[in-house]
Amino acid sequence: MARLGTACPALALALALVAVALAGVRAQGAAFEEPDYYSQELWRRGRYYGHPEPEPEQELFSPSMHEDLRVEEQEQQEPHQQGHRTPKKAIKPKKAPKREKLVAETPPPGKNSNRKGRRSKNLEKAASDDHGVPVAHEDVRESCPPLGLETLKITDFQLHASTSKRYGLGAHRGRLNIQAGINENDFYDGAWCAGRNDLHQWIEVDARRLTKFTGVITQGRNSLWLSDWVTSYKVMVSNDSHTWVTVKNGSGDMIFEGNSEKEIPVLNELPVPMVARYIRINPQSWFDNGSICMRMEILGCPLPDPNNYYHRRNEMTTTDDLDFKHHNYKEMRQLMKVVNEMCPNITRIYNIGKSHQGLKLYAVEISDHPGEHEVGEPEFHYIAGAHGNEVLGRELLLLLLHFLCQEYSAQNARIVRLVEETRIHILPSLNPDGYEKAYEGGSELGGWSLGRWTHDGIDINNNFPDLNSLLWEAEDQQNAPRKVPNHYIAIPEWFLSENATVATETRAVIAWMEKIPFVLGGNLQGGELVVAYPYDMVRSLWKTQEHTPTPDDHVFRWLAYSYASTHRLMTDARRRVCHTEDFQKEEGTVNGASWHTVAGSLNDFSYLHTNCFELSIYVGCDKYPHESELPEEWENNRESLIVFMEQVHRGIKGIVRDLQGKGISNAVISVEGVNHDIRTASDGDYWRLLNPGEYVVTAKAEGFITSTKNCMVGYDMGATRCDFTLTKTNLARIREIMETFGKQPVSLPSRRLKLRGRKRRQRG
């Protein structure tokens, strides 16, 4: 009794200490319920790097697991006391394989489907409650989308690695299809590369929520000079980044076959989907003459987590009822027909020609009077798919078609005004041959270039005639008479010959742009997030990058900014660069030549050969995003696509007529201080894109007296009306009179010579 009496105070003290400890653990657990995710992340990282050895947390495991852990700790302590050698049995937890097997053994299909559903839910709940052991699911295989390494949905903070050679080869560069810069020894290299070549290296993705992992896609290092790739690897998963379970193949660890070269992606599906938060890739072999380097994408389905405030806050949804899927050629044509049937009064389907393999290049016109050019109404176009593997632009334009039709039918005032005041042309797929090749590869396995070129191997983006060189050579010859105008520069004869290396698709676009008096256009591309404006070609010889502005540089800057500033991500200073270039210093815009020089681009050709101001719009880091990404990409670009079309109504517009009120075609419109002219269309109407300000504008035409007036451009949307009435010159009137009476006018020089000859004969 005395012993019991003395033991009671000690027992009470121990119970009090346990209560305090449990309260501390509860307080610590409560931190996970805070809405500020980043506080949780900092706490987790401190624990991750501060405790390299796993420490069991009492509240995160079930009571049955406490006994297993105690048994395991005893087995681990005894060898250390006997010689510090751990037997192989102590490496694997005892209960983890049993639990894994238990969950994997789902019952066969039975009559009571509700019972099976309840058991599946209970198993997933057990997986979510057990933060230490991942769960394998052997249910019907679900096709899971990529987590988003390539699309940057997975942030740099979610990527970790055992070691890295340097910052430019860190874990944050281990993204599928990421591209290296010209100088590969900078911060923007083409893969994650381990600091050492041994079997202890790994790269890890933190999904930040329970995820059903189903597969891994890998690539080698993107480099012009080096050959580095991983030829085999293991896959491990975890719920706490300390206790890891290796994907098994029977009783042993499964070795996945990796890459045999550095660019073609290789997909490996897990034999059984694994539910966990973390996934780790552990290279086992690599190219003999290279290093451990890889790029990757993870396939997985995030499990619903209503208690996670961070993910609910960042989920992207759309209210537009559109067809969010990838459309092959047949499906694209069918969607166009559906839109045309929905809105027959404002749409028209036509084709501008055929591809190398005979596929028609379909376009859709949207106008209140489809099929005709209305005097005073500007023409606008969108083009996508010049590179067949840059699929996002194609799908965005198909979504735009459907959206404009729906909103016009719903009497959306903004869309109705746009359709009634603009003639819109949309060409979703300029290179359908290349697209079909990329479509066969799929959104993740096509690599960076499959389907980029036409069927005959031509890059349409730089297949147009180089008119820049003709213009600049003429400008450099100041003493010689001007042979090349500053606009409507003629296409060289060699380019028009049948033997010229010109794609069928390129010739079709040129004929299309010569036929329709486009004022503004945008060609949608992929692989970056920026708007590029001309010139695209540098003026200085032997330079690959140099800012080369057009005479309308201020207008082009505004047009580019109008798209970028209304895009959800382009001007976001917090966003990560896609590959190597940081375009935030110019608010998501760039002069094409200062980025990289391109001779014969569509932008430069359009500016120098037609009236059209053309820009390249790079709509996403991922050229070919998964279908699940399309709603978010539509939300990112929808407002920008509409705002850019509305810019066709900025500047001045008018009609150039003669005294009888007839429109004068091919009249030249010049703006003082801008060394670039435009011309009137067949009805005498014109549109000149200008920023707000006061301008001195001149209209001139052959056989007419030049007319000049001041035109004011305001800040409000809508072009300022600036009409001209030209009077014929005396010589033109004489010629007109003589032609009316069937006689040719007598030229004055020849008449004077005849009079002189008569006088000489009379004197002689």
UniProtKB/Swiss-Prot annotation:
Residues 82-98 have a biased composition (Basic residues). SMART domains: FA58C, Zn_pept. This is Inactive carboxypeptidase-like protein X2. Keywords: Disulfide bond, Glycoprotein, Secreted, Signal. GO terms for cellular component: extracellular region. Highly expressed in lung and kidney. Moderate expression in liver and brain, including the cerebral cortex, piriform cortex, nucleus of the lateral olfactory tract, hippocampus, habenular nucleus, and choroid plexus. Residues 325-648 form the Peptidase M14 domain. Residues 142-301 form the F5/8 type C domain. Residues 1-27 form the signal peptide. Belongs to the peptidase M14 family. It holds the Pfam family CarboxypepD_reg. Disulfide bonds join C144-C301. May be involved in cell-cell interactions. It comes from the Eukaryota.
